[in-house]
Regions:
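N-terminal [4Fe-4S]-dependent radical SAM core
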Residues: 77-145
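Conserved Radical SAM active-site core
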Residues: 1, 123-124, 128-200
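Conserved phosphate-coordination/catalytic loops
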Residues: 10, 108, 171, 175
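Alpha-helical elements of the RecA-like P-loop NTPase motor core of helicases
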Residues: 17-18, 115, 157
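Glycine-rich beta-alpha loop elements in corrinoid/cobalamin-binding modules
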Residues: 1-96, 100-107
């Protein structure tokens, strides 16, 4: 529905870095057609090339899933299985006659990669668009919370963390966590305690 040229799914640091590296090298944006952890609307020629490589799954179309619960469930099963693999397959699903191609995710981040992401100078403040909306209960709950890792193998029915962050756990280094805790103590609203040290 979005008609986007390229979508990045999940936690996007690795695909964003790859996209930016290629653009910096002068690769035209319209040529970015096979980057891991992205989705594109593909031509039939591109779909044929993907199928020729053999590492793909054809999902039931969106339209079929709207009228067939079993087809929808089968698609979900494929997505769940592929999200629990080190080397997942490419997924192909048709929607309104167009092929949506979802490339496999990047490998789980290394400690150095996840540290580089978490060590950026975040403001720890809500987006400015919320400025005049009063308190944000969820923000108040996590304001002084520290993530020690990303990913979850659980797949609980009430939670989508594994869909966003993957089922493989990537852990931060002790030093990265300690640095964040020290930074928290300088926050003007810090009251002397950390509400949570844990997962996503």
């Amino acid at each position: 529905d979005s008609k986007a040229d390229l979508l990045i799914y999940g936690m996007g640091e690795q695909p964003i870095i790859e996209v930016l590296k290629l653009l910096k090298k002068g690769v035209p944006f319209h040529s970015l057609r096979n980057i891991r952890q992205t989705a594109i609307i593909a031509s039939e020629e591109e779909v044929a090339k993907i199928r020729a490589k053999g590492n793909f799954i054809d999902l039931s179309s969106h339209e079929v899933c709207l009228s067939d619960k079993k087809a929808f469930a089968a698609n979900f099963k494929h997505i769940e299985r592929e999200s629990n693999k080190i080397d997942a397959q490419t997924l192909i699903q048709y929607h309104q006659g167009k092929a949506i191609v979802i490339f496999p995710p990047f490998p789980t981040m290394t400690e150095a990669q996840i540290d580089a992401s978490f060590d950026l100078p975040y403001t720890r403040m809500p987006h400015p668009k919320y400025k005049n909306r009063g308190d944000i209960p969820a923000y108040e709950m996590i304001k002084f919370s520290v993530n020690m890792h990303r990913g979850c193998f659980g797949g609980c029915a009430f939670c989508t963390i594994s869909a966003h962050q993957g089922k493989f756990v990537a852990s931060r280094s002790k030093q990265s966590i300690v640095n964040e805790v020290k930074e928290l103590t300088n926050h003007p609203e810090f009251k002397g305690y950390i509400s949570d040290l844990g997962g996503p």
